[in-house]
Amino acid sequence: MIKGSSLKRIKSLVMMAIFSVSIITTAIVSSAADQIPFPYNATYPYGAYSCLADSQSSANNLLKSEWEQWKSAHITSNGARGYKRVQRDASTNYDTVSEGLGYGMLLAVYFGEQQLFDDLYRYVKVFLNSNGLMSWRIDANGNIMGQNAIGAATDADEDIAVSLVFAHKKWGTSGGFNYQTEAKNYINNIYNKMVEPGTYVLKPGDMWGGSDVTNPSYFAPAWYRIFADFTGNSGWINVANKCYEIADKARNSNTGLVPDWCTANGTPASGQGYDFYYDAIRYQWRTAIDYSWYGTAKAKTHCDAISNFFKNIGYPNIKDGYTLSGSQISANHTATFVSCAAAAAMTGTDATYAKNIYNECVKVKDTGNYTYFGNTLRMMILLYTTGNFPNLYSYSSQPQQGLKGDVNNDGAIDALDIAALKKAILTQSTSNINLTNADMNNDGNIDAIDFAQLKVKLLN
């Protein structure tokens, strides 16, 4: 039985929590049919870390706020043929590149915004070329920007394709598309036009490249494992293996850095850059995910080496570009390089450095005329480094029933759990508690409401 004074305290805590949540929560329009809702607060199957933030609930609130800001800057209906598109920034006259649609669709599916997702995909379909892949550059008025822009860019199309797979898992048959059919067709088009026959080398586009020129930052082995299972085409596993084979040949043995462009032998490609620059920086983001989701040993080896390079430099001193041997070629310190450095830290074991580079990622946000690229990568990597970028193809959001309230994960629900939860709330640090068990009401936040519900559970 709950005494009157205890009940009053519980009610007071609940009312304060509801009031505070109502103030700080930013609305995200999601689908009622969402089977895997945001936030995920996931524990990745592999690696020492899933969330680098001190507080999961604070990280989730930050993500909601950043998402609204990103949409305000980069989602527009202007020139979008009645739909929505991702616009770049003033530096490119607010044009659209297919890469942006890939990023935008990934973000929309992770944040659970089905209507936005569908509108972005409708825009994609307007600009599919004869190979069934998206023309890579469209101006702000909805015109393909010349003959060379008709071709597709592989990094964009693979992100579009995997987002369709995730949409199928998240929303099923609801919405304006049969996501399963769309995804399979798109993946098959990529395989037929962007994978070099006989070698499994990933081409940078549907109309050029292969063994003579490829781009390591386009390598997305975690995506290919999903594609293989989703379509039944085991050739995708060969593509993933080939990506690591090429990267092994191209990466510097001391720094671990990979080039923007190379041949399948890892040597410089004619007419293409061979530094660790604005393309190559994405390599560790895509590769780290392959470790977090699938435990691929080479992914950890490659990302650990790059992360050690950045750690030795010092996170405040990271600059936008290096030769493969590690010589600095830029004085800029932007969201592009800082966020991708944070992604690389996810495969390591230095918790102090990982938290420091995560906090730097939160801090460093681009402003001015050049905001699209860095802030978009930062947005996705903030998801990844806070446990909010699980593999939606295989992820289940169902809580572990029967463990609710076992905050300290010792197999019992008792006063020790009350103390652990109280400390976590007061210090805004959730690193030493089981988040799933502590989140009593499954709302993705650890707060006074959970504390009140845990007290009720114990008193009963």
Swiss-Prot record:
Boundaries of every Dockerin domain copy: 400-460
EC number, as in UniProt: 3.2.1.4
Active site (catalytic residues): E99, D155
Keyword Transmembrane recorded: no
Gene3D superfamilies (alphabetical): 1.50.10.10, Dockerin domain
PROSITE patterns: CLOS_CELLULOSOME_RPT, DOCKERIN, EF_HAND_1, GLYCOSYL_HYDROL_F8
InterPro entries noted in UniProt: 6-hairpin_glycosidase_sf (IPR008928), 6hp_glycosidase-like_sf (IPR012341), Dockerin_1_rpt (IPR002105), Dockerin_dom (IPR016134), Dockerin_dom_sf (IPR036439), EF_Hand_1_Ca_BS (IPR018247), Glyco_hydro_8 (IPR002037), Glyco_hydro_8_CS (IPR019834)
Gene Ontology MF term list: cellulase activity
Name of the top EC class for this enzyme: hydrolase
CDD domains: Dockerin_I
An individual GO BP term: cellulose catabolic process
Keywords attached to this entry: Carbohydrate metabolism, Cellulose degradation, Glycosidase, Hydrolase, Polysaccharide degradation, Signal
Annotated Pfam families: Dockerin_1 (PF00404), Glyco_hydro_8 (PF01270)
Family stated for the protein in its record: Belongs to the glycosyl hydrolase 8 (cellulase D) family.
Protein name as annotated: Endoglucanase 2
Protein source organism: Ruminiclostridium josui (Clostridium josui)
Taxonomic path: Bacteria, Bacillati, Bacillota, Clostridia, Eubacteriales
